[in-house]
Amino acid sequence: MKPRSMTLMMLRRRGAFSGCVPLAVVYLLGAAAAAQQPAASAPAPSAAQAPGRGRGPQPVDSRVQIRMHHFAEMNEDIPYALFVSSKVRKDKRAPMIVTLHGIGGTHTTMMRPNAIDLAEAGGYILLAPMGYNPRGWYGAPAPRGRRGAPPAPNQAPNAAAAIPAPNGAAAVPAAPPNTAAAPPQGRRGALPPGLLNNPNDPPNLRELSEKETLEVIDLVRKEFKVDDHRTYLMGHSMGGAGTLYLAIKYPQRWAAVAALAPAAFTVDREGLGKIPKMPIMLVHGDMDTVVPVTVGRAWAEAMKSVPMKTYQYIEVPGGDHGTVIGSHQAEIFAFFAKHSR
């Protein structure tokens, strides 16, 4: 039986918050096992393999297009994945969802069959950029540290405050807005060497990741008649951090965003004060051992304190870091369908 989710919806709340996110040491694992970026000179396969966490490579849905585009700044060809609903017409504006993978993932990681089914039913274009390489963070500030390093000292206190839940539902414990726990130890070896810090990466990797992501989005916008009032952003882990970062930096691009188990240890939550009208959904499993649930709770508390006009926080009992990707796609698509810019 699918575990029930605890959902918090905050509408037109009053309040204020302040604070910034402290640095944290993090062992990040995306939705998938680590996968390296395809070589620029190699042609994209027609049936790519999406990495699956602990289950080996998983075949990408045949409805997904694997494409390449030329990233002129680095003179490289970078892959991206695209699904276009059969309901999309060239002469009619279509909604688009951009989905960002976690660290070690690829452009195919988030192209899950249930997401494709929902995109087909809703008439969406579903776009998954690479973000230049598997660890670019889409421009978001990357957590400092290395594998095996001890957690940062700014752990969330055990006696955390609680986010009040409406309609008599159980309150969800929350870390204070200025606190985000570092991931627990014990995951040494979970990530291949060089995944977090690769000496071959360019020094401006984060900048390149952000630019390449936006370039692909604009490329698809030019090819199709994308509805700028119904363009959405979602991401998992590193991609969740990228989602929150890009939402704050480019609010004019998105009608709503969703972050799944966001590894947003070093994304400044004060930035939410700049986008109080942006609809945001957060999903986090309470058994996540990669990005602790205290991170999601801290962001939920910050959104309540802004106050955000509309946000939704779903904490999944028994949910781990990877399962939240597929388990709440329907809720995310339903949330997006309610909002336009």
Please place each PLM-identified region on the residue numbering.
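C-terminal catalytic histidine-bearing segment of alpha/beta-hydrolase fold enzymes
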Residues: M281-V283, T289, V293-R341
